[in-house]
């Protein structure tokens, strides 16, 4: 707050580690309003578009159900901090692979249930999918505790959509927005 920053989107994963309580105490001393918690996993690899497609969010089987359990704890911490939402990149949506899609829907449903039990909403971050695919996903899922964090720069970085038209399509589910600069990738 001394720097004039009053509202933040807070990374929650550090609160799950061995120094978690010290982290939370330091955060609370700042007096910030936390607009949303944010969950990420140390196994996620954002170095290329291909690596994040296979390592992002809750998609990797090698890390499930531990990733879901960690999310549930993060949702509880988010609520404890007074925020009403926790956001994350849940992973790559792929409707073309029926088995993968079913697993993915089930996992996101689990996250939505865990968020609801904690009294917060899961906000899926836009990025690796078109607005049309994401709309299809949330309409099919129909979960009251699963909404969206709209990140227009991710749509540009992943070369998936035009931000304004994407926002118009997704607006009914948008509850939080990230703003940052981005350049469209030249290597998809």
Question: Model segments located where?
Answer:
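Short, acidic/polar
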Residues: 1-2, 19-23, 63-77, 159-168
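Catalytic domains of carbohydrate-active enzymes, especially glycoside hydrolases
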Residues: 1-14, 74-77, 81-82
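Acidic/histidine-rich catalytic cores of soluble enzymes
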Residues: 7-8, 37, 105-188
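Glycine-rich, proline-tolerant flexible connector loops at the mouths of alpha/beta enzymes
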Residues: 7-30, 89-96
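Residues that line or immediately flank small-molecule/substrate-binding pockets and catalytic motifs
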Residues: 12-15, 41, 90, 174, ...
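Glycine-rich, aromatic-flanked loop segments that form ligand/cofactor-binding clefts
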Residues: 27-44
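Flexible glycine/acidic-rich beta-alpha junction loops that bind and position SAM and/or redox cofactors
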Residues: 42-47, 96, 182-188
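Active-site acidic/histidine proton-transfer and metal-coordination neighborhood
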Residues: 45-148
